[in-house]
């Protein structure tokens, strides 16, 4: 639990992990949880377990009348991650890139409102959903400004915004404009493009994803990597695609090596 609230321990955990595995970037928060909390939501943090949302914060859209975008420089919750970034930016300079994860606007909205209610509201109360997404996006832009101060890039993930839950038309209306605004703003403020991970079967929204300012699009392992290479590989860098459970978590070293090599062999054609 301390990992989420103590800047020194966040930095220590990331330092230990990097020294052990030597991966190609260090990703810090605030992520979806930190931004949800900054906007008023509440998570439960088990002593040893994955945090989970206590209950939706927005039970009535009247709350938006008093909700404002967060200035992260004045927000204690976000400043924990800023302090960790300050520590690691000095240690990691010229060694490994740092990124700040800022979640995705639609997923943050789902945490504040509740997934079921948010999806219903997209049909019945679209104006209110847009009001909420504007506040979230402005808050994420403040996080981007913070990241820029430490020379960090930006990572995003928007799992609720996948076609298993919303169709392409809904994605175009409620996700694309805000994500496009964020990726454009990231380049403007940091000089770096965004790392984006999208869960699920995303074929139907590829035409939107390729319009973002991305240094990589990380695809779910259920995606046909060969098809991705052929259809969008010349428009955007592709990453991911190794099964995180069956291979990375439960597989042997040899199985992991084979899976990674297969992805590289397919992806190098892009």
Q: Can you describe what each PLM-predicted range is?
A:
Residues 1, 17, 24, 28, ...:
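Active-site loop segments of alpha/beta catalytic cores
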Residues 2-9:
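Surface-exposed strand-loop-strand hairpins of Gram-negative outer-membrane beta-barrel proteins
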Residues 6, 57-63, 75, 252:
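Intrinsic-disorder/low-complexity, polar/charged segments
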Residues 14-43:
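Glycine-rich, N-terminal phosphate-binding loop and its surrounding beta-alpha-beta segment
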Residues 34-71, 94-95:
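A contiguous, low-structure linker/loop signature
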């Amino acid at each position: 639990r301390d990992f989420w609230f103590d800047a020194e321990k966040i930095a220590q955990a990331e330092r230990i992990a990097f020294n052990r595995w030597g991966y190609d970037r260090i990703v810090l928060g605030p992520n979806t949880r930190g931004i949800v909390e900054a906007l008023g939501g509440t998570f439960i943090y088990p002593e040893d377990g994955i945090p989970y949302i206590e209950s939706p914060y927005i039970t009535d859209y009247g709350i938006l009348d008093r909700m404002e975008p967060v200035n992260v420089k004045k927000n204690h919750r976000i400043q924990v991650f800023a302090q960790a970034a300050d520590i690691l930016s000095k240690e990691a300079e010229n060694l490994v890139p740092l990124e700040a994860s800022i979640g995705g606007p639609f997923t943050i909205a789902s945490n504040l409102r509740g997934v079921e209610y948010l999806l219903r509201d997209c049909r019945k109360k679209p104006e209110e959903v847009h009001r909420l997404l504007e506040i979230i996006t402005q808050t994420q832009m403040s996080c981007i400004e913070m990241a820029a101060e430490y020379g960090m890039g930006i990572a995003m993930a928007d799992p609720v915004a996948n076609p298993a839950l919303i169709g392409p038309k809904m994605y175009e209306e409620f996700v694309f404009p805000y994500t496009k605004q964020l990726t454009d703003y990231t380049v403007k403020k940091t000089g770096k493009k965004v790392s984006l991970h999208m869960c699920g079967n995303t074929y139907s929204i590829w035409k939107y994803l390729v319009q973002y300012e991305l240094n990589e699009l990380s695809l779910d392992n259920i995606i046909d990597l060969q098809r991705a290479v052929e259809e969008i590989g010349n428009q955007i860098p592709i990453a991911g695609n190794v099964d995180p459970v069956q291979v990375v978590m439960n597989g042997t070293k040899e199985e992991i090596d084979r899976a990674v090599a297969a992805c590289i062999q397919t992806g190098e054609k892009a």
